[in-house]
Amino acid sequence: MRRWGMAKIAVVSLGGAGTSIMREMLGIASDFDAYNVNERRTLKNARYFGYEEMEALAEELSGYDCIIFTAGLGSRSGDALVDLYGMLDGVRRLCFLVTPFYFEIERLMRSRAQLGKIMTEDFEGAVLTLNSLLRDMEEAEPSKSKLEKLVRRFDREVASLIVEMMQEVR
């Protein structure tokens, strides 16, 4: 268990969006305890847990002073986040959550329900929307490759923000 200053901090990524942000974070710095929840193991420098292992992960994380979550909402990873977040009530939780594009109607509705369960008076963190990327698009119908580049830049910026914040805690 690594310490940042006096605090024991872990970073937990959930699902595709969370994993992409974590991948960028690990490219910037690797001196933190990284945990990844996904359908399959995709990160080399993170402890992996499957979606069905939330109780075991919560038990392992209960020894930390602060847990930083990165996750996309609107899918299975958002549901896992809601469960895990609730299991860690006694630990400080800081969330960097990503909501779907406005045109992903079903995922957007599901993300709102997930946010409703997490955004209590003790919520700390940021809720970021992928819709902000569309402002950078010049075409009415953006190409998939351009959108993927914008999402990667978004992931890098969020990762940099989290790593910078963690370094200030030192």
Curated annotation (Swiss-Prot):
Protein name: Uncharacterized protein AF_1120
Domain of life: Archaea
InterPro entries: Tubulin/FtsZ_GTPase_sf
Highest classification ranks of the organism: Archaea, Methanobacteriati, Methanobacteriota, Archaeoglobi, Archaeoglobales
